[in-house]
A protein has these predicted regions:
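Short N-terminal helix/helix-N-cap motif within the alpha/beta-hydrolase-1
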Residues: 68-71, 94, 149
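Structured core elements
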Residues: 59-61, 81-86, 137-141
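Conserved phosphate-donor/acceptor-positioning beta-strand/loop module used by diverse small-molecule
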Residues: 73-96
Length: 230
C-alpha cells in the first residue's frame, strides 16, 4: 500500500528518547537505546503512521532520508523490507538538481554539495550492506526501464508478496501522490530519462570531479567522455 514520504521515523525516535528520559541529543541518543526502546520505537512508528494506511500487510514509506537509519529500522521493525532504489550517479544527482522541492534538501541546489552528499550516501549504504546483510534490496532504475516484469517479480519475491498483473500497470492508480514523482507515476515506464545527464555533461564538471571514484567503477560506456578519452 502506497503512502507518502513519511517523517514519522525521526519523530518516533525523538518521542521514545524523551519518554525514556535520555538526555543525550538526537541522533546520538540512539546509542543509549536498549531492547525496550527499540521495541517502543517500532510500536510508536506503526501507531503514528496508521492515519496514512489501511489494514494491508505492507505499506511503503518513501522518505529518501530513511537510508541513514537502516540500522535503527532493522532493530525497531525486524520484518521491514528496505528497497534501495538506485540509478546512474550522475542521473540521480542531476535529477535532484533540476527539481524544486517543496521544502528541505538545500544541498541539491549546489552541484558540489550534491556530489558530496551522494558520496556520503554511498559510504553509508556500503556500511549497511556489511552489517545488515539481506535486509535490503538494490533495484537499479535502468534495469526497471529495460525489464519491468522481471524487476517487479524480483521486488515482490524479496517482499514475500505474490505477483499481480496490476503491478505492471502502476500508472492506473487513482491514489493521490504528493512527491516529486507525482507526474511520472501516471505514465507507463519510459526510457527518455536514462543517461539524461549526457545532454548536460559539459556543465556537470564539478559534480563529475567529486563522483569520479564511483564513476571510474562503471562500465566504460557509462563513464563521462572525459574519462574514456584518457
Amino acid at each position: 500500500e502506497g503512502t507518502h514520504e513519511l517523517h514519522e521515523m525521526v519523530s518516533s525516535m525523538r518521542s521514545v528518547k524523551e519518554s525514556s528520559n535520555i538526555d543525550t541529543r538526537f541522533p546520538h541518543a540512539l546509542e543509549s537505546f536498549k531492547a525496550r526502546q527499540w521495541q517502543l520505537l517500532g510500536q510508536e512508528y506503526l501507531k503514528t503512521t496508521e492515519k496514512y494506511r489501511t489494514n494491508k500487510l505492507f505499506f511503503i514509506d518513501k522518505n529518501p532520508n530513511n537510508f541513514t537509519f537502516i540500522g535503527a529500522i532493522k532493530l525497531a521493525i525486524p520484518n521491514a523490507k528496505i528497497i534501495n532504489a538506485k540509478r546512474h550517479p550522475l542521473d540521480s544527482c542531476f535529477g535532484s538538481y533540476k527539481q524544486l522541492f517543496a521544502s528541505g534538501q538545500p544541498f541539491s541546489y549546489d552541484l558540489t554539495e550534491l556530489g558530496e552528499y551522494y558520496m556520503e550516501y554511498e559510504r553509508i549504504m556500503s556500511h549497511w550492506k556489511e552489517v545488515c546483510e539481506g535486509f535490503f534490496l538494490d533495484v537499479n532504475y535502468e534495469d526497471v526501464v529495460s525489464d519491468l516484469d522481471s524487476q517487479v517479480k524480483r521486488i515482490l519475491e524479496f517482499c514475500e508478496l505474490p505477483f499481480e498483473e496490476s503491478c505492471l500497470r502502476f500508472y492506473e492508480t487513482k491514489r493521490a501522490v504528493k512527491t516529486a514523482s507525482s507526474e511520472q507515476v501516471r505514465k507507463p515506464i519510459y526510457s527518455s530519462s536514462v543517461n539524461l545527464w549526457r545532454n548536460y555533461e559539459e556543465k556537470l564538471s564539478d559534480l563529475i570531479e567529486i563522483l569520479e571514484p564511483l564513476l571510474r567503477e562503471l562500465p566504460e560506456q557509462d563513464q563521462p567522455k572525459s574519462f574514456v578519452s584518457h
